[in-house]
């Protein structure tokens, strides 16, 4: 191979490798942050669902208490 073409080939390889490395170094942290945010959103939805169930149970107990108090005579 002629030395002129070898130099062009090496420079081209350096440019391509640098672009790929920049792309991967930008892609990997972005992918990690996307996965962690999805995990946090899933956990948050579960917490909100459990709070909703807790409030439903609380309202049911409150209604049971109202029924119990309504059975007592008024003094």
Swiss-Prot record:
Q: Which GO terms describe its cellular component?
A: extracellular region; membrane; other organism cell membrane
The answer, when asked if Mitochondrion is one of the entry's keywords, is no
Name of the protein in question? Antimicrobial peptide ctriporin
Starting at the broadest rank, the lineage of the source organism is:
Eukaryota, Metazoa, Ecdysozoa, Arthropoda, Chelicerata
Per the UniProt entry, the propeptide covers: 47-75
The written remark on domains in the entry is: Amphipathic and cationic peptide with an alpha-helical structure.
Keywords, sorted A to Z: Amidation, Antibiotic, Antimicrobial, Cleavage on pair of basic residues, Cytolysis, Fungicide, Membrane, Secreted, Signal, Target cell membrane, Target membrane, Transmembrane
Q: Where in the cell does this protein reside?
A: Secreted; Target cell membrane
Instruction: Say which species the protein is native to.
Output: Chaerilus tricostatus (Scorpion)
Provide the function of this protein.
Antimicrobial peptide that acts by breaking the cell wall. Is active against Gram-positive bacteria, fungi and antibiotic-resistant pathogens: S.aureus (MIC=5 ug/ml), M.luteus (MIC=5 ug/ml), B.thuringiensis (MIC=10 ug/ml), B.subtilis (MIC=10 ug/ml), C.albicans (MIC=20 ug/ml), methicillin-resistant S.aureus (MIC=5-10 ug/ml), and penicillin-resistant S.epidermidis (MIC=10 ug/ml). Also shows potent activity against antibiotic-sensitive and -resistant Acinetobacter baumannii (MIC=10-20 uM). Shows cytolytic activity against human erythrocytes.
Spell out the disulfide connections: none
Give the GO terms filed under biological process for this record: defense response to bacterium; defense response to fungus; killing of cells of another organism
Positions where Lysine amide occurs in the chain: 41
What residue range is the signal peptide? 1-22
Summed up, the tissue specificity of this protein is: Expressed by the venom gland.
> What family does the entry list?
Belongs to the non-disulfide-bridged peptide (NDBP) superfamily. Short antimicrobial peptide (group 4) family.
């Amino acid at each position: 191979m002629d030395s002129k073409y070898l130099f062009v080939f090496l420079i081209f390889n350096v440019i391509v490798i640098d672009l790929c490395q920049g792309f991967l170094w930008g892609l990997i942290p972005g992918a990690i942050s996307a996965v962690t945010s999805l995990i946090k959103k899933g956990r948050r939805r579960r917490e909100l669902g459990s709070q909703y169930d807790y409030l439903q149970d609380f309202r049911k107990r409150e209604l049971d208490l109202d029924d119990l108090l309504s059975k007592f005579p008024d003094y």
